[in-house]
Design a protein with these regions (language model features):
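Glycan-recognition and catalytic cores of secretory/periplasmic carbohydrate-active enzymes
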Residues: 1-473
């Protein structure tokens, strides 16, 4: 949709399909309306009753997708879902040492979904009459039970319908529901919780730290960025050994040589983290990850990346897959990340490896494009490189300059705000500061004259977002 919008002829059908689907997911039974986060999948055509397991690898991409939907449409449903999901991740899915856990089980006390289910009497006991009336109308407690004699909360009426039904303003409805949900959340917390899969998986941490860094940047919330940085730091300290990644850890035990997804997703996460908050150590590590990707995973004859490294135990057949499945394609994420790192550092070696991957994958992409969205994103970044902006200045000045970009949908623009005292490789060090903040705007390897005027900077952001906002926003 974004690409068609830039031509002046946006494909509104595509956007509607995506927004409508996400709206039904975020308002229906796939979303935890008290604690945040998405369940694994729906078991019915109405998307009302889920399999109650919560997976880290689902919630990372969905967190990021909700924020993109919010910045396009202005619909606070998506913003609220993103915030509640990010808060759930920090509250329940991040260890004290920083790593993100893998999943929450569907069962508690031997019953599917028991932790999440309600009945009208138990809800009414927690709320006053006005709170109960509103919440029952909103989440279906005034309708027949929908799961084995119990009620699983799903949105039946939106805020506008509730405001009309109860003759209250939208703000009043939101305030009352927020209070009521808080009471139910506190009561639910006293129940026996679902089991926690406390493995820390490198690949899934890469997906989530990318989403949390993106959320922190879009919402101007340093706590989310700090959460992402803590995850990266955990992986670096516990799962980066002898300049190679390990795939999983639990407690003090880390093991298994990492796979393509581990390297690709961590590289992608670090590049997003660098956009949220610059730290040169993450750039250095990103380069190391990219180097291992090329040295240990690339098919030297045909291009593309194997799932296992060259020094992995010998297999009957080494897999090299290109399509997306439950998680994005490792080849697609690797190619796009290598392109971005190559553009940032003016390093042809990374760009050429991505090009070889895209050429190797082309037949597979061409046969079933819809199954290769990650590689199509990488192909888009190769054919039409993203606008890459490097902003230099003091930390205080950078914060002020970046403010206009918060909450904006700019899918083809990457902004790296680098403090003046950062230690940098030559290509970035050449983008030096002057007496004030300066922004270097590049596409691929070509850079325009630097911008030092805040007015020019705001104009650049406006130009990049003008065609990507819904008219009714």
């Amino acid at each position: 949709w974004a690409r068609t919008a830039e031509t002046g002829n946006p494909d509104s059908r595509i956007l509607h399909t995506a927004i409508f689907s996400l709206q039904q997911m975020s308002s229906g039974g796939l979303f935890d309306h008290l604690g945040g986060g998405y369940y694994r999948y729906s078991t019915d055509a109405q998307w009302m009753i889920p399999h109650f397991e919560k997976m880290l690898y689902d919630n990372g991409p969905l967190l990021q997708l909700n924020l993109q939907a919010w910045t396009i449409t202005g619909n606070t449903l998506f913003k609220d879902a993103a915030i509640e999901t990010a808060d759930w991740v920090m509250r329940e899915m991040q260890s004290e040492t920083g790593g993100y856990y893998s999943a929450l089980d569907a069962d508690s006390e031997g019953e599917e979904g028991k932790f999440y289910l309600w009945d009208p009497e138990s809800v009414a006991a927690q709320l006053d009459d006005s709170e109960y009336a509103l919440l029952a109308s909103r989440f279906g407690l005034d309708r027949p039970a929908n799961f084995e004699g119990h009620w699983h909360l799903h949105a039946c009426l939106d805020y506008r319908d509730l405001a009309e039904k109860f003759d209250r303003s939208d703000d009043e409805i939101r305030t009352i529901l927020q209070t009521a949900r808080g009471k139910l959340f506190a009561q639910r917390a006293q129940r026996t919780h679902p089991g926690l899969d406390d493995k820390v998986l490198t690949a899934w941490n890469g997906l989530m730290l990318r989403a949390m860094a993106f959320a922190g940047r879009q919402l101007d919330n340093p706590a989310y960025i700090d959460s992402a940085a803590r995850s990266a730091d955990y992986i670096y300290r516990h799962l980066w050994k002898n300049n190679r990644l390990l795939a999983t850890s639990r407690g003090d035990q880390a093991h298994l040589n990492a796979y393509l997804d581990d390297y690709a997703f961590m590289l992608s996460g670090l590049l997003e983290l660098l956009q949220a908050q610059w730290d040169s150590k993450w750039l250095s590590w990103a380069q190391q990850l990219a180097d291992v990707l090329i040295e240990q995973f690339e098919d030297k004859n045909s291009g593309g990346f194997y799932f296992t490294s060259h020094d992995h135990e010998r297999l009957i057949q080494r897999s090299k897959t290109y399509n997306d499945e439950a998680i994005p394609s490792g080849n697609g994420v690797a190619a796009e990340s290598l392109l971005l790192l190559g553009y940032l550092l003016a390093e042809p070696r990374y760009i050429e490896a991505a090009e070889r991957c895209l050429k190797a994958a082309w037949n597979s992409i061409n046969q079933a494009p819809i199954s290769h969205c990650s590689l199509l994103e990488a192909l888009d970044a190769y054919l039409d490189p993203p606008q890459l902006v490097v902003v230099r200045g003091t930390s205080g000045e950078l914060k002020q300059w970046l403010q206009p970009a918060f909450g904006k949908f700019m899918p083809h623009t990457c902004v790296f705000a680098i403090p003046d005292d950062a230690l940098l490789p030559p290509a970035l060090a050449a983008k030096s500061i002057s007496d004030s903040v300066v922004a270097y705007v590049c596409e691929g390897m070509q850079c325009s004259p630097p911008i030092s005027s805040s007015t020019e900077w705001r104009d650049l952001i406006a130009d990049n977002t003008a065609s990507l906002q819904q008219p009714n926003r």
